[in-house]
Amino acid sequence: MADVPKREIENVEFVFEVMGSAGEGIDAVDLGDALRALNLNPTLALIEKMGGTKKRNEKKIKMDEFLPIYSQVKKEKEQGCYEDFIECLKLYDKEENGTMMLAELQHALLALGESLDDEQVETLFADCMDPEDDEGLIPYSQFIQRLMSDPVVFD
């Protein structure tokens, strides 16, 4: 694929190998996780458009199908960036000091937009979250930095 540099192709192949099953490819239900492991932030609608499924074992995606999907998703403009996420979380920053209630972040992740489940939120917090202070507040900018620098892969 001419528009994907060799180093990126190696990363794509590595993620594909880790997430796939011996020679069969990756399950289409894991397409979003594979793309996120490659530092992309596709929406659920985009994942579905690219061939992702909601049920396991409906479809397998082979490497020769995955690379063009990766390339296309990489070009998509509707991906959140650091500044977008910070602006969103500022809405919960009542003191305007870079902190928000951990419970509010948890509620937002569980209930709003493309929501996560309890297990995914626990994994996300374990990998990216500083401990909350005595008042239940967390610094949200460090959370977003960690989240975007080291993608979390859900089992």
Swiss-Prot record:
Transmembrane segments: none annotated. One of its GO terms (molecular function) is calcium ion binding. PROSITE patterns: EF_HAND_2. GO terms for cellular component: muscle myosin complex. InterPro entries: CALM/Myosin/TropC-like, EF-hand-dom_pair, EF_hand_dom. Keywords: Motor protein, Muscle protein, Myosin, Repeat. It holds the Pfam family EF-hand_7. Residues 7-41, 80-115 form the EF-hand domain. It comes from the Eukaryota. Myosin is a hexamer of 2 heavy chains and 4 light chains. This is Myosin light chain alkali. It comes from Drosophila pseudoobscura pseudoobscura (Fruit fly).
